[in-house]
Amino acid sequence: MTEEFNESMINDIKEGDKVTGEVQQVEDKQVVVHINGGKFNGIIPISQLSTHHIDSPSEVVKEGDEVEAYVTKVEFDEENETGAYILSRRQLETEKSYSYLQEKLDNNEIIEAKVTEVVKGGLVVDVGQRGFVPASLISTDFIEDFSVFDGQTIRIKVEELDPENNRVILSRKAVEQEENDAKKDQLLQSLNEGDVIHGKVARLTQFGAFIDIGGVDGLVHVSELSHEHVQTPEEVVSIGQDVKVKIKSIDRDTERISLSIKDTLPTPFENIKGQFHENDVIEGVVVRLANFGAFVEIAPGVQGLVHISEIAHKHIGTPGEVLEPGQQVNVKILGIDEENERVSLSIKATLPNEDVVESDPSTTKAYLENEEEDNPTIGDMIGDKLKNLKL
């Protein structure tokens, strides 16, 4: 009888088989299962019920539940011809989890998982088994307190699988990086040269300011920060400041964007529109001498030209004979060209002279129409008085 019993056992369910059955009894430390097609009942110890820690079997199963498990051992009593299948539901869940995670790793897919615990080195998550997100793989940004993730469902990617050592490493940072790259590509495609947009000063260097314009940084060169001369970016902008910028150029291959704050600001000449008129006599300061005349600043950042013929009633060979930089002078406005931002001035017309000589209108016309040699551009006409102006 015993020999027949042993032979039937060998031909029956054996160790390593996968079986199904119905939960008949839930005890404190184990679950009794009626095995479909089996000669005995199955026993699932509490430690083999779940991939997670549980204090009671009732947390995961109840009587009448259909369960699937691996047979880890077959026990039988030859004398009484009784036995039991020792089962592991945990082993089967772990196997399914690894299979699922391997597929996601192979396809570089995103999964969602709940953070079950926050530890010093990172986050513990539930991915069908215990998974770990190291601190270095939590975010692309610095996060001081990881407790904000406790209990949250997060989007992650599988970074590493090692079933032999029961090791599952995941990355939330990889998902963020992928999303940031997608936003960056979309933004780069939507931007065009000449667009005026808003951004935030991200960092400052000696040569300019980097502006975050929505996931992409663009550079405002120090020469594009203001109409007036700027020594260092800190003179006009600060980190975190919201600014308006104009896109000067885009290189989508290298993801380099050149920006300008200066181009979004009114020029010094625009700031004085309506303030001065032809024939007004005003005060100014000599800022530069040239062979053909003197440049006089009549308002912060605005310079006009006094042609050499308009400096004195007497003939002079060079402006330096009667003028020097820094000298205060009275000037009369002979003409204003708003389109080209030019002002023609005369010192001579403000000086007393018994034999009054009228200003030569051809000289004024030549300057305003850009016929003089070495005529200044708007850059030549910008002084340094607005250095301390903040945007």
Curated annotation (Swiss-Prot):
Entry-linked InterPro entries: NA-bd_OB-fold (IPR012340), Ribos_protein_bS1-like (IPR050437), Ribosomal_protein_S1-like (IPR035104), S1_domain (IPR003029)
Domain S1 motif: residue ranges: 16-90, 108-173, 194-262, 279-348
UniProt GO BP: translation
GO molecular function, one term: structural constituent of ribosome
Gene3D superfamilies: Nucleic acid-binding proteins (2.40.50.140)
Family the entry assigns: Belongs to the bacterial ribosomal protein bS1 family.
Name of the protein: Small ribosomal subunit protein bS1
Taxonomic source organism: Staphylococcus aureus (strain N315)
Gene name of the record: rpsA
